[in-house]
C-alpha cells in the first residue's frame, strides 16, 4: 500500500494531468458557490428543526424533492431486524418510542450540492422500540446525515446513528424477528480507492484550502498521519469503533484493534466534503476478519461497514479528528452481537 506521504506528494504534483472517467462540471464562481452552499445548509437545517413539530408536514413538502431517496436510515439495523415489520415511517415511529425526543444540531458542513449534519438525539424510552419494550431509561446518542440537493430541494440522504450505543444505554439485546432470522448488512465492494479519489480531486488543480484539505484527509487512507503531520495540540476525541474499544479495554484486550483484526484491511471512499478548515470523509472499512477483535475470535468472514471521519485541518496540519463507525453492523456481520451485548 502506498504511504500517506507518497500519496500526498504524488497527488499534489499531478495537478490537472489526471483525468476523471466522467465529464467535468463547470464550477460556480466562488461567491455563487458559497451562496449556494449556504442555501443548501439552510434547507437541511429546516428539514431537521421541523421534525416533530406541527409544521413538519409542510416543511417536508417544502424541502424534499418529489423523487427524494433515503439510501440508509439512522436506526438501520434495528429497523431491519424488527420483530414487527408493520411500523409506520421511521421518524414517527422513533418519536413514539421516545416521546420527549429532542435533536440538537452540533455541526453542519456544506460543500456544493452536498451537506453533512451531525446531531445529538436525547429522550426517554417510553414506547416499543422495534420489539424492545419500554425501559424508562434515558438515551443520549449521536446521528449524522449526508444530503444531496438540487434546485433547493433534498434529493438524497444517508443517515447513520449510534445503534450499538443505543442498545447499551437501554441495557437491551437485539430483538428477535418473528421468522428467527438476523438481517446482516451486505458486503458490496462499493466505494472508491483512495488513489482514484485523489485523482478525481486533482482533475483541476486545488484552488484553495478546502480542496487541499480534502487531499490531506484522503491521503491519510494510505497511512495514519505522522507526528509531523499533526499540530502540536492535535486532539482525536473519538475513535470509529469506540464502544468496541471500550469493551476490549474492560476485558484487557484493548490491543486487538480493528486494523489488527483485518490484516488485509482496505478502506474505500464514498464522500469527501470540505468547508473552511472542516473536512468530512465517509468511507467503508473492509477486509477479512483474520485476527482477534477485542476478544471476538477470528471468523474469516468478509466485512464492510461505513465510517465517517470529521476533521479540522489548519495550515495543512491535522488539528482535530472524530470518527464514528457502524459498530452494530460489524457485529452483525461477525455474528457477535450477543457476545458483546451479553
Positions of predicted regions on the chain:
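C-terminal and inter-domain tail/linker signature
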Residues: 2, 9-20, 28-342
Amino acid at each position: 500500500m502506498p504511504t500517506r506521504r507518497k500519496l500526498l506528494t504524488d497527488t499534489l504534483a499531478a495537478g490537472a494531468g489526471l483525468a476523471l472517467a466522467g465529464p467535468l462540471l463547470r464550477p460556480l464562481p466562488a461567491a455563487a458557490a458559497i451562496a449556494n452552499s449556504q442555501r443548501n445548509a439552510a434547507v437541511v437545517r429546516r428539514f431537521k428543526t421541523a421534525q416533530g413539530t406541527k409544521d413538519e408536514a409542510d416543511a417536508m413538502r417544502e424541502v424534499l424533492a418529489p423523487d427524494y431517496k433515503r439510501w440508509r436510515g439512522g436506526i438501520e439495523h434495528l429497523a431491519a431486524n424488527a420483530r414487527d415489520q408493520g411500523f409506520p415511517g421511521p421518524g414517527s415511529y422513533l418519536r413514539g418510542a421516545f416521546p420527549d425526543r429532542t435533536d440538537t444540531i452540533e455541526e453542519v458542513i456544506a460543500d456544493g450540492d452536498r451537506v453533512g449534519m451531525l446531531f445529538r438525539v436525547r429522550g426517554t424510552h417510553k414506547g416499543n422500540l422495534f420489539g424492545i419494550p419500554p425501559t424508562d431509561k434515558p438515551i443520549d446518542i449521536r446521528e449524522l446525515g449526508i444530503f444531496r440537493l438540487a434546485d433547493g430541494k433534498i434529493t438524497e440522504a444517508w443517515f447513520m446513528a449510534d445503534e450499538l450505543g443505543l442498545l447499551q444505554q437501554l441495557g437491551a439485546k437485539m430483538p428477535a424477528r418473528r421468522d428467527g432470522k438476523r438481517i446482516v448488512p451486505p458486503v458490496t465492494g462499493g466505494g472508491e480507492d483512495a488513489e482514484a479519489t485523489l485523482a478525481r480531486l486533482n482533475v483541476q488543480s486545488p484552488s484553495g484550502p478546502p480542496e487541499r484539505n480534502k487531499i490531506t484527509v484522503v491521503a491519510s487512507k494510505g497511512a495514519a498521519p505522522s507526528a509531523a503531520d499533526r499540530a502540536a495540540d492535535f486532539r482525536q476525541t473519538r475513535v470509529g469503533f469506540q464502544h468496541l474499544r471500550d469493551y476490549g479495554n474492560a476485558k484487557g484486550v484493548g490491543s486487538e484493534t480493528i486494523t489488527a483484526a483485518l490484516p488485509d484491511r482496505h478502506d474505500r471512499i464514498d464522500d469527501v466534503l470540505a468547508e473552511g478548515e472542516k473536512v468530512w470523509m465517509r468511507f467503508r472499512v473492509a477486509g477479512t476478519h483474520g485476527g482477534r477483535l477485542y476478544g471476538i475470535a477470528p471468523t474469516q468472514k468478509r466485512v464492510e461497514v461505513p465510517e465517517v471521519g470529521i476533521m479540522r485541518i489548519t495550515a495543512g496540519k491535522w488539528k482535530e479528528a472524530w470518527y464514528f463507525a457502524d459498530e452494530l453492523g460489524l457485529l452483525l456481520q461477525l455474528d457477535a452481537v450477543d457476545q458483546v451485548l451479553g
